């Protein structure tokens, strides 16, 4: 099948089939974007009734870290594209699937392998590409960890090499923090890996996500890199609580950010959107991480861009033209579950949507936890400050409540 030249009809022999591995809120938006282009979508996750399951043509529940289960599902569904949307996947199975020519892995199996592991991507960025990063060390045992902390110095940040959304991440400020940080990291990894990265603390002015799109240029037929406006965000305990676009920054810092993003995404290859996380202080920029998929801070693009990050990803992986331009300043603010219960309800939706320029995405997750992201408020404004105030006001109006 010539991706980009021909799209079929879902649920027919001509269908263009895409399998998403990971069906959370980001995967759900990718599925919707693909379906608007007439793509047949198979959603896969580790638990039933995930947000993406609710909108896909077919849904499956498997342990995606089990290579045999993953290969069996791909063989049964025969997708044209496999699109990982989370880190906890048997990437060796994806590499075998790609090598056998069964289907294409987005962006590539190698990119998925490197980016699911903080060690792989940090060594690529710092040691192979020579990109500026914080000082770092890796540790496999508590003794190695304590030695790494002593070498890096206080304060430092510890993260499992395999985790996401801040899980297992903490700041070590003194000797008293070392043992609790190790225990927390061991409990927070998405895969039982037992290895951590210790990073020196960078005193930055702000953090950004530089969404970077690798897509086919219709004029040349070659892969071209383009950029969204920089996204600023606020993190608490490693998890995003607010994002806004555009983030004001100097011309030099923007140039350096895009150069770093271009270099790391070119090294990873393939097509699709990449979320490149960077620290910025004045004109100086440091590489932090990269995800070869839509980024949670990029939820703001549902309001800020004519083509959201999800639409850009869908178009890029299908070989279609993209347009990542900013349409309006906008912001997002997270809505947490606030309670531990299945099948919760939400009050205050009317009040939230009465905020000028506001919109909501309630993700439909079947089970709530106090700190689980259950939705997001979006808002536009004449400028970023107004958009942020509106988004926070709309998010605060939504009240998760027990449905019992």
From Swiss-Prot:
GO terms for molecular function: ATP binding; magnesium ion binding; phosphoribosylglycinamide formyltransferase 2 activity; phosphoribosylglycinamide formyltransferase activity. Residues 123-318 form the ATP-grasp domain. GO terms for biological process: 'de novo' IMP biosynthetic process. ATP binds at residues 118, 159, 164-169, 199-202, 207. Its EC number is 6.3.1.21. Signal peptide: none annotated. It comes from the Bacteria. It catalyses: N(1)-(5-phospho-beta-D-ribosyl)glycinamide + formate + ATP = N(2)-formyl-N(1)-(5-phospho-beta-D-ribosyl)glycinamide + ADP + phosphate + H(+). InterPro entries: ATP-grasp (IPR011761), ATP-grasp_carboxylate-amine (IPR003135), ATP_grasp_subdomain_1 (IPR013815), PreATP-grasp_dom_sf (IPR016185), PurT (IPR005862), PurT/PurK_preATP-grasp (IPR054350), PurT_C (IPR048740), Rudment_hybrid_motif (IPR011054). One of its GO terms (cellular component) is cytosol. It is an enzyme of class 6 (ligase). Mg(2+) binds at residues 277, 289. Pathway: Purine metabolism; IMP biosynthesis via de novo pathway; N(2)-formyl-N(1)-(5-phospho-D-ribosyl)glycinamide from N(1)-(5-phospho-D-ribosyl)glycinamide (formate route): step 1/1. N(1)-(5-phospho-beta-D-ribosyl)glycinamide binds at residues 25-26, 85, 296, 365, 372-373. Keywords: ATP-binding, Ligase, Magnesium, Metal-binding, Nucleotide-binding, Purine biosynthesis. The keyword rRNA-binding does not apply. Belongs to the PurK/PurT family. Homodimer. Involved in the de novo purine biosynthesis. Catalyzes the transfer of formate to 5-phospho-ribosyl-glycinamide (GAR), producing 5-phospho-ribosyl-N-formylglycinamide (FGAR). Formate is provided by PurU via hydrolysis of 10-formyl-tetrahydrofolate. This is Formate-dependent phosphoribosylglycinamide formyltransferase.
């Amino acid at each position: 099948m010539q991706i980009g030249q021909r799209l079929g009809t879902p649920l027919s022999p001509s269908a263009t089939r895409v399998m998403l591995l990971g069906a959370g809120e980001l995967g759900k938006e990718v599925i919707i974007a693909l379906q608007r282009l007439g793509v047949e979508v198979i959603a896969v996750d580790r638990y039933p009734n995930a947000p993406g399951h609710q909108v896909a043509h077919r849904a499956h529940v498997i342990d995606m870290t089990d290579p045999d289960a993953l290969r069996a599902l791909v063989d049964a569904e025969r997708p044209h594209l496999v699109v990982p949307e989370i880190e906890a996947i048997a990437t060796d199975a994806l590499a075998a699937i790609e090598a056998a020519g069964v289907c294409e892995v987005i962006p590539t199996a190698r990119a998925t392998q490197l980016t699911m592991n903080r060690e792989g991507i940090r060594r690529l960025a710092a040691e192979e590409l020579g990109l500026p990063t914080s000082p770092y060390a890796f540790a496999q045992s508590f003794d190695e960890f304590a030695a790494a902390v002593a070498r890096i110095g206080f304060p430092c940040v510890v993260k499992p090499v395999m985790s996401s959304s801040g899980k297992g991440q903490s700041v070590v400020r003194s000797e008293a923090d070392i043992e609790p940080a190790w225990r927390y990291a061991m409990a927070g990894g998405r895969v039982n890996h037992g290895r951590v990265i210790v990073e020196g603390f960078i005193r930055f002015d702000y953090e950004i996500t530089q969404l970077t799109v690798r897509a086919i240029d219709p004029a040349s037929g070659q892969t071209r890199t383009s950029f969204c406006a920089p996204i600023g965000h606020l993190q608490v305990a490693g998890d995003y609580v607010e994002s806004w676009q555009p983030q004001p920054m100097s011309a030099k810092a923007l140039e350096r950010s895009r150069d770093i993003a271009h270099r790391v995404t070119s090294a990873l290859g393939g097509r699709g959107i990449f979320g490149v996380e960077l620290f910025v202080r004045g004109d100086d920029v440091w590489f932090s991480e990269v995800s070869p998929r839509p980024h949670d801070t990029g939820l703001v693009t549902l309001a800020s861009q004519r083509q959201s990050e999800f639409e850009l990803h869908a178009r890029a992986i299908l070989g279609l033209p993209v347009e990542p331009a900013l349409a309006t300043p906008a912001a997002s603010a997270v809505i947490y579950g606030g309670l531990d219960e299945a099948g919760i309800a939400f009050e205050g939706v009317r009040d939230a949507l009465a905020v000028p320029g506001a919109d909501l995405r309630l993700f439909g997750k079947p089970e709530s936890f106090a700190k689980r992201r259950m939705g997001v408020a979006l808002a536009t404004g004449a400028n970023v400050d107004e958009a942020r105030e509106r988004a926070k006001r709309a998010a605060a109006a939504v009240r998760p409540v027990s449905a019992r």
